[in-house]
C-alpha cells in the first residue's frame, strides 16, 4: 500500500480529533505524518501488547501540542487506545488529554507540552540506556540495546532548556539518541524567521552532534535513508526535516492558521479530497489497520529479546536477577533492615554537623546498597556534597559510572532526571543551591504531575549561607515546594532527620522529593525510640512538658535548635512548652487526625512557628492567633550570625514573642 496513504490515516484522525474536541493542534501532526509513518512502521522496536518491555525503543513527542499524532500512532499500531478514546480527545477523564500525559494512554513515555522538556527527557532516557548497557551488557549478550527517538519543533529549540540538554548530549556522545526537527517555519505568531533565525544545523554541529540537513519531510525514501544513517553514527543525530505545517489542507497549510485551531468542517472535507482520503470522520479501512498493526511484529521482537535474556540469565544469573530487580523498581531485600539500623546508629552516635554533610553521610551509608543510584549536581558537587566514595563519573567513552556532572544546567538536569526515572533502572538524584531550584521549577512540577521519582538535594537553605547575599539566599522557595501537589519536601534539623528524609525519598516511587539542607552546622537532638520512629510522620513531639502545654513551638531545620533553647528557658520560668519538629509538612498532613491532634492539640491555640523562610506559609499550623518568626523580606549580604540576629532568629526573640503571646 502507498506509504502516503498510510500517513494520511494520521492526518485524517488528527483533523477529526481536533474538530470533534473543537480545540487542539492539527498542523504538526499533519506535517510530521510522513516522518512518523516511516519511523513507526520501519524502525521503531516496540510491542503494543507490552508497553513496558524493558528493551523497547522510546518515542517522545517533545512538541506535545501535536498530541493527536501520538494518539493516532498508538491507536493504529494496536495499543489499547480505541477509536472512542480518540473521539474523546481533550475530554474529562479521557485517555487522550490535550497534551500527552504519562500514565493515561499506554505507550506515552512522558508528559510533554511545556516545550523543550520532551527533548530533555529524551536525553535522560538515552543516558539511562547507555549507562544500563555499560553496567549489564556482556560480550555476546547485549540485553540493553535500544534507541530513543524524539520529534521536536521550533518552539522546543527556542526554549533555553534545549541548549542545556543537547549540549550535554553531544558531550556525552549519546549515539542512540535521534531527534527529528520539524522545520516548518511556523509558530503561533506566524513565520518564525522574524524571531528564530538561528543556523540550527551549525548549532548542533557545535554540540558535537551528527547533523543530517535538508531532509524532505514528505519524502519517505529520504526520511528512511536519514534514519538509517542516524542509527549507524556513534553520535547523537539531528535529522532536519523540512515540512509543511498542516500538509494537505488546501487553504491553511503552510500558515499559522492550522497551528492551534480546528480546520473547520469545510476545510477538512477539502483536505481529505486533496489527500485522496475517501472516508468519513474517524473511519479507518481495515486494510489500513492491517498495514499499521504492530502487534505481531512487536510480539516477535520481544520474544527474540526474551530468548537473548534467557541466555544472559544462564550465563550471568546474579546480574540477570539484579537487572530484573532494578528495571522493576524494587529495593534490595535487606534494604529496610539495614537502612533502619543505620538511622538508629546515627541517633546513638551524635554529631553536630551541617545537614548537607549529613546528607553526604547518608549517601555513603545507603549508596553501597543501591547500585541503581545515579547522582549528580549542577556544577556544585563540592558545595552540595553529592559525591561519595562509590561515585564514578559518566564519561563519553565510559558510561559504567553512577554520577553525572551536569554543569551549570539546573533546568536541564532536573528534566534529564525525569527521563532517567521514566526509563527505569535507576534512582536519580541531583543537586543545586535551594535558590536555584527556581531555574528548574517546571521540571520538578512535571515530576510531581507524572508521579515519577526525582530526588533533589537543595543545599544552602536560608539566610544561613551568609555573605553571598540575597541573590543566593532562598526565602519563598521552601513554601513554594510545599505548595506543589504531590511534592514531598523535607527540611531536616540534624543528621538523624537527614537520614530519615533520604530513606523515605529512596522508597518513594510515586513522586519527587525535595531534600533541603543547611550550609551551617546543626546540633543533634535527643530522641527516644518512639520519637525516632515518628520522624517519618513529618512532624513529631521533640520536647514535651508535664500535662497539657500552654504553648507549642513548631520549627524546622536550623531553627529547631533555637526552639529547643527557647523552650528550655521558658520551662525554667515555669511555662509548659512543647517543641514540635516538623521536617515535612506534607508527610505530617497525611497522618490520621488522631496523630495530628496528639501532636498539635486544637485546644492549644498559642503557637509559634519558627523557620528562616517566608512567614505566611505557617498560618495553616499556628492559626491567625499564633505568631510566626520568619522572613517577610529578602535577605542581606553579611555573616550568617549577624543575619540571624537581624531577622529575629535568636533565643531572646523567641522567648519574648512567647511571653507576649502568653500574656
Swiss-Prot record:
Site location (Important for catalytic activity): 25, 259
GO biological process: pentose-phosphate shunt
Transferase in keyword set: yes
Cellular component terms (Gene Ontology): cytosol
Molecular function via GO: metal ion binding; transketolase activity
Short name of any one Pfam family annotated for the protein: Transketolase_C_1
Chain residues that bind thiamine diphosphate: 65, 113-115, 155, 184, 259, 436
Keyword hit for Metal-binding: yes
Residue sites binding substrate per the record: 25, 259, 356, 383, 460, 468, 519
Source superkingdom: Bacteria
Gene3D superfamilies, per the entry: 3.40.50.920, 3.40.50.970
Annotated binding of Mg(2+), by residue: 154, 184, 186
Keywords: Calcium, Magnesium, Metal-binding, Thiamine pyrophosphate, Transferase
Reaction catalysed by this enzyme: D-sedoheptulose 7-phosphate + D-glyceraldehyde 3-phosphate = aldehydo-D-ribose 5-phosphate + D-xylulose 5-phosphate
Assembly description: Homodimer.
NCBIfam families listed in its UniProt record: tktlase_bact
Purpose: Catalyzes the transfer of a two-carbon ketol group from a ketose donor to an aldose acceptor, via a covalent intermediate with the cofactor thiamine pyrophosphate.
Protein name in the entry: Transketolase 2
Amino acid at each position: 500500500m502507498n506509504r502516503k496513504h498510510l500517513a494520511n490515516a494520521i492526518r485524517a484522525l488528527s483533523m477529526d480529533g481536533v474538530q470533534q474536541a473543537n480545540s487542539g493542534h492539527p498542523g504538526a501532526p499533519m506535517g510530521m505524518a510522513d516522518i512518523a509513518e516511516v519511523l513507526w512502521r520501519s524502525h521503531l522496536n516496540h510491542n503494543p501488547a507490552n508497553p513496558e518491555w524493558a528493551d523497547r525503543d522510546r518515542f517522545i513527542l517533545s512538541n506535545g501540542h501535536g498530541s493527536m499524532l501520538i494518539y493516532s500512532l498508538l491507536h493504529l499500531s494496536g495499543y489499547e487506545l480505541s477509536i472512542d478514546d480518540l473521539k474523546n480527545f481533550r475530554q474529562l477523564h479521557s485517555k487522550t488529554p490535550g497534551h500527552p500525559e504519562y500514565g493515561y494512554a499506554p505507550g506515552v513515555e512522558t508528559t510533554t507540552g511545556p516545550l523543550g522538556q520532551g527533548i530533555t527527557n529524551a536525553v535522560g532516557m538515552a543516558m539511562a540506556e547507555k549507562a544500563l548497557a555499560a553496567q549489564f551488557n556482556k560480550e555476546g549478550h547485549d540485553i540493553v540495546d535500544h534507541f530513543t527517538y524524539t520529534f521536536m519543533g521550533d518552539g522546543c529549540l527556542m526554549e533555553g532548556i534545549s541548549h542545556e540538554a543537547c549540549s550535554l548530549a553531544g558531550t556525552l556522545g549519546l549515539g542512540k539518541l535521534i531527534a527529528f526537527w520539524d522545520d516548518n517555519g511556523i509558530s503561533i505568531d506566524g513565520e518564525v524567521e522574524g524571531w528564530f533565525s538561528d543556523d540550527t544545523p551549525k548549532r548542533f554541529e557545535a554540540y558535537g552532534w551528527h547533523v543530517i540537513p535538508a531532509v524532505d519531510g514528505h519524502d519517505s525514501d529520504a526520511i528512511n535513508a536519514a534514519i538509517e544513517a542516524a542509527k549507524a553514527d556513534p553520535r547523537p543525530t539531528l535529522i532536519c526535516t523540512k515540512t509543511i505545517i498542516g500538509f494537505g489542507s488546501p487553504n491553511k497549510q503552510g500558515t499559522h492558521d492550522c497551528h492551534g485551531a480546528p480546520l473547520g468542517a469545510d476545510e477538512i472535507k477539502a483536505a481529505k479530497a486533496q489527500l485522496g482520503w475517501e472516508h468519513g470522520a474517524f473511519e479507518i479501512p481495515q486494510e489500513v489497520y492491517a498495514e499499521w498493526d504492530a502487534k505481531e511484529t512487536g510480539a516477535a521482537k520481544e520474544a527474540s529479546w526474551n530468548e537473548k535474556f534467557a541466555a544472559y540469565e544462564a550465563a550471568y544469573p546474579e546480574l540477570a536477577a539484579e537487572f530484573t530487580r532494578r528495571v522493576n523498581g524494587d529495593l534490595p531485600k535487606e534494604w529496610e533492615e539495614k537502612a533502619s539500623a543505620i538511622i538508629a546508629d546515627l541517633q546513638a552516635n551524635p554529631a553536630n554537623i551541617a545537614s548537607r554533610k549529613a546528607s553526604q553521610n547518608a549517601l555513603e551509608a545507603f549508596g553501597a546498597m543501591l547500585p541503581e543510584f545515579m547522582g549528580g549536581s549542577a556544577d556544585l558537587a563540592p558545595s552540595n556534597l553529592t559525591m561519595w566514595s562509590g561515585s564514578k563519573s559518566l564519561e563519553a567513552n565510559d558510561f559504567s559510572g553512577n554520577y553525572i556532572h551536569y554543569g551549570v544546567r539546573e533546568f536541564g538536569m532536573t528534566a534529564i532526571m525525569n527521563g532517567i526515572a521514566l526509563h527505569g533502572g535507576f534512582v536519580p538524584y541531583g543537586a543545586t543551591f535551594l535558590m536555584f531550584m527556581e531555574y528548574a521549577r517546571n521540571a520538578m512540577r512535571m515530576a510531581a504531575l507524572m508521579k515519577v521519582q526525582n530526588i533533589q538535594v537543595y543545599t544552602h537553605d536560608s539566610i544561613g549561607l551568609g555573605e553571598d547575599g540575597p541573590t543566593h539566599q532562598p526565602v519563598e522557595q521552601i513554601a513554594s515546594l510545599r505548595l506543589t501537589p504531590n511534592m514531598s519536601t523535607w527540611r531536616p534539623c540534624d543528621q538523624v532527620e537527614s537520614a530519615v528524609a533520604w530513606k523515605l525519598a529512596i522508597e518513594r516511587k510515586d513522586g519527587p522529593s525535595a531534600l533541603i539542607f543547611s550550609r551551617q552546622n546543626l546540633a543533634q537532638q535527643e530522641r527516644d525510640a518512639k520519637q525516632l520512629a515518628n520522624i517519618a510522620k513529618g512532624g513529631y513531639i521533640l520536647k514535651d512538658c508535664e500535662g497539657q502545654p500552654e504553648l507549642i513551638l513548631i520549627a524546622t531545620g536550623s531553627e529547631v535548635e533555637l526552639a529547643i533553647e527557647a523552650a528550655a528557658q521558658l520551662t525554667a520560668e515555669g511555662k509548659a512548652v512543647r517543641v514540635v519538629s516538623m521536617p515535612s509538612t506534607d508527610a505530617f498532613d497525611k497522618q490520621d487526625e488522631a496523630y495530628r491532634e496528639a501532636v498539635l492539640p486544637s485546644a492549644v491555640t498559642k503557637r509559634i512557628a519558627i523557620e528562616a523562610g517566608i512567614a505566611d506559609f505557617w498560618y495553616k499550623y499556628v492559626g491567625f492567633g499564633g505568631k510566626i518568626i520568619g522572613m517577610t523580606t529578602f535577605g542581606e549580604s553579611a555573616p550568617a550570625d549577624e543575619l540571624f540576629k537581624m531577622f529575629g532568629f535568636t533565643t531572646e526573640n523567641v522567648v519574648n514573642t512567647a511571653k507576649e503571646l502568653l500574656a
